[in-house]
Amino acid sequence: MSNSNSRNKEAETVHHLTSRIAHRVYFLKECERNDLLEIVRRAADFTGIRLLGWCVMSNHFHLLVLLPQRVEVGEREVLRRYGVLKGQMAAEEVAGSFSLWRQAGDAGEAKVVRWLDSQRRRMYDVGSFMKIVKQWFTEEYNRRNGHSGTLWEAVYHDRGVKCEGRAMAACLAYIHLNPIRAAAADSFDGYAWSSYAAFCRGDGVAVAGMRYVYGVEYTCDEMHQRHEELLESLLEKEKLRRAAEILRMRAAGYDAPLDPLTTEAFLQQAARHFEEVRQEALRLREERMISESAGSRQTVLEREIVAALTLKPGSDAKDLSEVLGLHVATVYRLLQAMANKGLVTHGEHGGFWCA
């Protein structure tokens, strides 16, 4: 989804944003990942978007952001944000231009207003935020590497996330698990360009993002514990998914080597687990089939009882058992069930009638 989507301006929405390097032929060095994160922070400050979490990989990045309610941004705040984005010297130059323009009276004041409005239109908009991030980083990357042209895929991905703790935490954990899945780190907090590592270091933006996701009632230690548990759960699911794929490939006769998340011992354990799951599914299916069969048989017998009572109203369980060839106790249970459903009525002397 591109930055033309109207949801990009819908206030109080949470977005999972992803963008990849075009053709995945370039890989970001460590210093370039640092530069990208710095641009992300500056763009978020300028646009008013709140960073909840991030992870910058070698050829793509993930961001979890909150688009807050738009607020009125005065001249001083516009200049402050512009300084964050462009540098303090650029902001001072603009402020100096304002002074010169205003000497021209109303026409100059109108020019100031137009400039301020042009900056305000770039704020509180996910599309504008992503445009700044991608465009600014491309310019820096091209300058540093002697490259020209586009760096990113044309369209970034924007997936809406329910603004609810569990959904946001699951998305954030998915983002933080990227380095483990890619074998770029061997611990959840061991990847420097992840907001989880920043949270563990006490980074203010990362801590505030985790607090928004988990709730202000939790301490940092409690958030750390809850997030670690969620990451462990997701990692286990990922390992099982990869094990299932390897086992399917091997069963089909293909050479399927292990990856960094699996071992032969884990594959054997996973195979036993999958077989247990398969057997349990078969057992439940058989139970359901038996239950459905029993239900169908009961329906048939109920119809036969109704037919018998139509021919001979007032028959009791013994009379009906002789007609149907069933045990008296079975017929009586059927009659009681039918009475509860309102299909038959029970007389004072033990007989039954169709309702």
Where are these regions (language model features)?
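Short Pro-Cys-Gly-centered "Cys-loop" motif that presents a nucleophilic cysteine in a tight turn
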Residues: M1-S58, L66-E304, T310, E322-V323, ...
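Proline- and acidic/polar-enriched loop/turn elements at helix boundaries
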Residues: V56, S187, R333, G350-G351
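Flexible coil/turn residues that form the inter-helical turn or adjacent wing/linker of helix-turn-helix
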Residues: P313
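A generic structural motif
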Residues: F61-L64, G351-F352
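Residues within the helices of the helix-turn-helix
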Residues: A307, K318, Q336
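Short amphipathic alpha-helical interaction segments
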Residues: H327-A337
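Short, cationic-aromatic polyanion-contact patches
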Residues: G295-E302, D316, H346-A355
